[in-house]
Amino acid sequence: MMGPMASDETRTGTRTEGRTETPTRTTRSTTPGAPAARDARVPGPAPEATGTRAWTPWRVRLLVLGIVLAAVNLRPAITSLGALLEEVRDGLGMSGSVAGLLTSVPPLCFAVFGVAAPRLARRFGPGAVVFGGMVAITAGLLIRPYAGGTAGFLAATALALMGIALSNVLMPVIVKRFFPDRVGSMTGLYSMALAFGTSIAAAATVPMTDALGGHWQPGLAVWAALGAAAALSWIPFVRARKASASAGSPAHTGSAGATESAGAGAPRADAPAEQPPLRITRSRTAWALAVFFGLQATAAYITMGWMAQIFRDAGVSAGTAGLLLAVIMVMGVPLAFVIPRVATRLPHQGPIVLVLGVCGLAGYAGLYFAPAGGAWLWALLLGVSNCAFPLALTMVGMRARTGAGVAQLSAFAQSTGYLISIPGPLLVGVLYQHSGGWGLPIALMSALMVPQIVVGVLAGRDRTVEDEAAR
């Protein structure tokens, strides 16, 4: 599957990955003193000049599988709770304000723990950090339904969200480092997997809860199985340090598992150790991307935490409300693959931002005036708007030239963005409790879409943070 994708994206590799770099698809060694490289179409591992393990075809496929499984686990902890929020509130005796605090925990954890991801990856390697993240997700999901009381529930939720935060930040970094000429395709692939995990948890949590006896505890705990499966797939990469990128990167593996060497044993141009730290806060594009990330995250976590309840309060059954939430999330499966590929072919991503924003405004307007009457249409429109997330991830990869730049930009944009998004779900809960309805919260959601469009257009301009930070 990855072979055909690579050929499509080769044209955009140089523009996307760096405007001053040479194309990565080289078939002969160009490094003085390096062994002669194999022909690009002859299967076989790259030379192990650096002492790291070669990227054999099965290892490349296992890495792709690990990325997909990790992405599937990045949202079920949140959407499964959204589907059963009313039952959890009743079971733990939560008020609307406390429930609003609960829905604000994800962005808070993402902001606090996400900033540590690049430092941990430099010390232990990204594979080890993602593996640890999957273990934390598994443990948190197993513990939280049975922790006893609101405090224990929040603490176990925070443990799972810590694992999600670390993996959130490192996914764009791993894609940029190991698949530099396939950023659009690989971003689309793991964004599809993320959307699939999000939607399946929203749709299946209520039916599985009923099948498991009608108690919300096992209905939430069952999602730990996904985390365990993902953790197993990352075990082979626990000892893969950052230097492995210079010894036969999977980015240079063809569709038949062939290895394309650009100088055996030569350091990669995007090796983090070779890049000086960026003064990322001097980049206007970095700030625009961070605010865009924060506003789309605000909309996403309000949707995941409250949308099912909005439909239920409008007279929709619990099962149907879960399906409507799933429709919103499942729209990301096809669109999360299409949007990054389209975005990498455009010099400016502003038109995509505008289309997504208009869909969001239309969906919120319908939800305000006829929440139950046009519920399925509003869900479709909000599902399209929700695809601002894969677009933001794609722009993270496009707005920096190097792997080190992507790591810093990803950590900055996500951590700052999630800090921005913290008040949103909490404010929705407070407005709902004190107004007694959903009119004011929906008006707030709609109003936030306007600045999201503005900063998204600014973030989509064709420039890099390295150039801006150097000024």
Protein language model features and the residues they cover:
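Juxtamembrane intracellular "pre-TM" segments in multi-pass secondary transporters
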Residues: 47-57, 239-289
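Conserved MFS/SLC helix-loop-helix module at the cytosolic interface between two early adjacent transmembrane helices
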Residues: 112-151
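Cytoplasmic helix-loop-helix junction between adjacent transmembrane helices
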Residues: 156-194
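Helix-loop-helix hairpin linking two adjacent transmembrane segments in secondary transporters
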Residues: 181-182, 189-242
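C-terminal transmembrane helical hairpin of 12-TM major facilitator-type secondary transporters
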Residues: 349-392
